[in-house]
Amino acid sequence: MHTRMRRLVAGLLLAGASVSPAPVTAPAQVLDDPAVGAPGLGDPYYPDDGNGGYRVEHYDLTLDYDPPNRQLAGIARLSAIAAQPLRAFELDFNGPEVRAVTVNGRPALFERTGAHKLAVSPLLPLLPGLPFAIAVDYAGQVTDTPDSGWTVSPSGGAFAAGEPHSAATWYPLNDTPLDKATFEVRVTVPQEWEVVSNGLRTRDVADGTHRTVEWRLRDPVAGYLTTVAIDHFEFLEQRRADGTPLFSAFAPQAVSRRELENRLPEILDFLETLYGPYPFETGGGIYVDTDLQFSLETQTRPIYAPWTDLNTVVHENTHQWWGDSMSVTQWSDICLNECFASYTADYLWPERKEGKDVDRMYRETVDKYRDDPDFWSIPLQNPGAGREFTVVYTRGPLFLHALRHLLGDAIFFPAMSRFVQAHRYGNAAMPEFRSYLQTLTPIALGGFLAAWLDGTTPPPDSDLFPGTLSLG
């Protein structure tokens, strides 16, 4: 994510092996009934998010949307595997009215509970280790939820975007980064509208009155990184030198951003030099003309607000490595996403592509904010619920630049690439990252990491200015 406020602050500051995900299980204390999947996985910030007892392997959505009336009809088909005996389980969903639910083709009892839960009781119990199929039929007017899900655009179209939540406003899912699944969606709209989503477009058929468009994402994705966008788009199709197709869309009032997106092949080439091969089979962007407060790294095809600039495009595409391919384990791990995306866009691109003296920029930033207690008051690791998207954008780049100087470029850059590649299509956590850093050097890093990641005051000079930063 790249917020408008973060963009303003950034502007001032600038003047391995694949890891297989484990079954999703809930903390033991919430399992009151061993045959009922837990309604929430106990994330410290969002304990009700996600659901225990099963793992989703694939989402298959069939949607019909009527923009003038904001009417959405959908059938969500989920392919899942039970992790325990189940006579009941829950999904996350706060979208339109649910009309019917089936499990393995048989009608199931269901009930809407809490703010965003759909409780399901299959006709027959589910056995651990076996696959099962869920189908949810729903329809109704979609609520306009700007910045946190389904959003109506100025043209009357719509798109879905939000972090950490958005997907549950338009389809039922297991809404946790721990349960990533493959994804496909087919959307039918009046013929004059276009539809864009994640992955590759595999079908676009018009019958004279309606258009049906299908998109498929073959690599696993967290729910909040899925999107669908419906508008009178103009398209830009490009290819990288290796043949990777890039598909970008521009809403009617966003076509002026086409020049930015022309640089996407160059941006992805640059990011590969830092973090290894691009992790997906396609890329692109969706440029909306709604007054969003953020841009978002929706997988393969970020959502861009009207104020997007080059820094934003670099930031969101860095997330394809740090945040999308490798996702957080808990939301307290958000520095793994935003610290790296911000450092790459604010420091590495200016340094290597524009010739900026980023050491000088670092020192000037530290001097400017060193005596500002508010700048240091929130820890980088575990910033707290509702504060995830604050200091990771401003202090995050400072931390990584200091770490780079402490380790040296010859260690820092290969090590960061190895870490993100080792967690490709999986999850990582900040405690794991800290332990990994210590394996890179005989220097004891405990004090340095505690000062930067846990502290709420400026680090001591030895940690603020390690290595050649002390020579400025």
Region locations from a protein language model:
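Glycine/proline-rich low-complexity spacer/linker segments in large multi-domain proteins
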Residues: P128, D137-E184, F233
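N-terminal, polar/Ser/Thr-rich
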Residues: M1-H2, R6-R7, A22-A73, P154-G157
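Hydrophobic helix-coil surface modules that form long, contiguous segments used
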Residues: G74, T176-V314, Y343
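Surface-exposed beta-strand/loop patches in extracellular or lumenal glycoproteins
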Residues: I75-P96, Y171-N174, F183-P190, P431
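Zinc-dependent metallopeptidase catalytic helix centered on the HExxH motif
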Residues: L178, T300-R360
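A surface-exposed beta-strand-loop module
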Residues: F89, F93-S153
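Acidic/His/Gly-enriched intrinsically disordered linker/tail segments
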Residues: R218, E338-L407, A450-G455, P459-D461, ...
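Beta/coil-rich, acidic/histidine-enriched accessory regions frequently appended to metallopeptidases
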Residues: G53, A422-G472
